[in-house]
Regions:
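Compositionally biased intrinsically disordered regions enriched in Thr/Gly
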Residues: 17-257
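Sec-dependent bacterial lipoprotein signal peptides
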Residues: 1-15
Length: 257
């Protein structure tokens, strides 16, 4: 599907939007806190900033891409809605879930904030952050990065970074099987391992659980190559954070479709 095109684009410096319509996006932003009980300090904080394509795509492609973003960012139950309806639906469902999970404890702590000891103010505070950005319009493919942070108590929250990829013409999702020839895994794994060390500082590299990384289905495409994303705890401790490893196209031309 993309073999010669990807290789040629690297050599010639051609980017995907050349000769095609530029994709324009709309950003939907919401930032608010919703109290557990009226007058209380506990709340669920919701921050959303999501880009959705609005121009430069066919109607079916735009709908497919928007639904793909909504499904991974907000939940499958909101697919088929307008993007604004989906965002509002997510907020309402999240607030309901927060209150359902915590209101039963309100008589113990939340109703009597004056009785709390120091450090107890956020005992029932949750936080959700969702940010989605169009990363690249490359060679007939759109890559989108989605960051999701959640905190529902405990020592710290968790962050998830997802790469979403779509065929620009149709809006269909892109997987590794669409990009690489059969049996690509070993060759691509070798290339990823070769670039892992240079993607980290020495201390972080030495802390990894494993250096035998393999393709994990979480990636974005760009002129620079294919960038794989490894999440918190996936190949290293939480302190290292999210790890990105890029393999240039010219190093893996032999396994492209």
């Amino acid at each position: 599907m993309i073999s010669a095109a990807l290789a040629a684009a690297t050599v010639l410096g051609v980017i995907g939007c050349c000769g095609t319509k530029e994709v324009k996006v709309e950003t939907i932003e919401k930032n608010a806190a919703y109290a557990l009980v009226e007058g209380g300090r506990d709340s669920v904080k919701i921050e959303i900033s999501l880009q959705f394509p609005t121009e430069g795509l066919g109607a079916e492609a735009a709908e497919g891409i928007c639904d793909g973003i909504v499904m991974d960012a907000l939940g499958e139950q909101f697919c088929g809605m307008t993007t604004h309806e989906a965002v509002q639906g997510y907020i309402e469902e999240t607030v309901k879930n927060y209150r359902d999970a915590n209101l039963e404890f309100v008589d113990q702590v939340a109703k009597n904030p004056e009785d709390r000891e120091e450090g107890e103010w956020d005992i029932f505070t949750w936080e959700f952050m969702i940010e989605g950005r169009m990363e690249s319009d490359y060679n007939g493919f759109l890559s989108y990065s989605l960051t999701k942070y959640s905190y529902t108590g405990g020592a710290h929250g968790g962050t998830l970074l997802l790469g979403l990829n779509f065929i620009k013409e149709t809006g269909d999702p892109v997987t590794e099987d669409d990009i690489f020839a059969f049996g690509y895994e070993e060759r691509l794994s070798t290339a990823l391992r070769a670039h892992l060390k240079s993607s980290l500082d020495k201390d972080s590299y030495d802390m990894l659980f494993t250096t035998d990384i393999t393709p994990n289905g979480n990636f974005v495409l760009s002129k620079a190559g294919i960038t794989y994303i490894y999440g918190q705890y996936e190949i290293g401790p939480y302190s290292i954070g999210i790890i990105k490893v890029t393999v240039p196209w010219d190093e893996i031309q032999d396994i492209l479709k």
